[in-house]
A protein has these predicted regions:
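GST-like fold's C-terminal all-alpha helical module
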Residues: 100-193
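GST-like domain detector, emphasizing the conserved glutathione-binding G-site
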Residues: 1-126
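Residue-level recognition of oxygen-bearing side chains
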Residues: 67, 183, 196
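Exported/periplasmic ABC-transporter solute-binding proteins
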Residues: 199, 203-204
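Structured helix-beta-strand junction loops
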Residues: 49, 75, 148-149, 194
Length: 205
């Protein structure tokens, strides 16, 4: 059985949604970040990065959301979720998830994790103040150019969709005006209508 570690409000929700989508048999363990459980020896032995998600498989441990999403889809024979039928579609899915991981998630992290980049209290506050602007900018590209609708790549649901949904759930707290993002909000509603999303949310949030 697969075992996944997650935390409320974290990006790990995306992986749990996908596990529900493919009807995987898995065990969910929630970490309490407010108590620093991600830094304790028991979890450090699983993932020395001290972050979630982490997925324990029969072959070993996987970390990082793009890798875990890809593994789940391939493990359960859901090739359509990764665009395996077409090398270009496959690459576009990787491109989209790479943008979420390397750009959008990092912009969000400046609000809560500024100490990763600086120890200067004034600089940390400056990073926080910049978040509404920077998150609006990076998410605007998705709204205007990348989101095809009804799913991220058009008619076919892919591993990008739970990933984008999870990040979009942070936008209001990041100070982004979501009324100016009709496509993204329609995507959110489409995701909320899926039983897998509701099943994951009921366990984590």
């Amino acid at each position: 059985m697969l075992k996944i570690f997650a935390a409320p409000g974290s990006i790990a929700l995306a992986s749990v949604i996908l596990l529900e989508e493919v009807e995987a048999d898995y065990e969910l363990t929630l970490l309490d970040f407010s108590r620093g459980e991600q830094k304790e020896a028991a979890y450090q032995a699983v993932n020395p990065k001290g972050r979630v998600p982490a997925l324990i498989t029969e072959s070993g441990v996987l970390t990082e959301t793009p890798a875990i999403l890809f593994y789940i889809a391939k493990r359960f024979g859901a090739d359509s979720l990764v665009g395996a039928h077409d090398p270009f579609v496959f690459a576009k899915i990787q491109e989209f998830n790479s943008y979420l991981a390397s750009t959008v998630h990092v912009a969000h992290a400046h609000r809560l994790r500024g100490s990763r980049w600086t120890d200067d209290p004034e600089a940390i506050e400056a990073l926080k103040k910049k978040v509404p602007e920077s998150m609006t900018q990076v998410i605007r590209l998705i709204e205007d150019d990348l989101l095809k609708g009804p799913w991220t790549h058009g008619e076919a649901y892919t591993i990008c969709d739970p990933y984008l949904f999870t990040i979009s759930s942070w936008l209001e707290s990041d100070g982004v005006d979501t009324t100016a993002l009709p496509h993204l909000m329609a995507h959110r509603e489409n995701m909320l209508a899926r039983p897998a999303t509701q099943a994951a949310l009921s366990q984590i949030n």
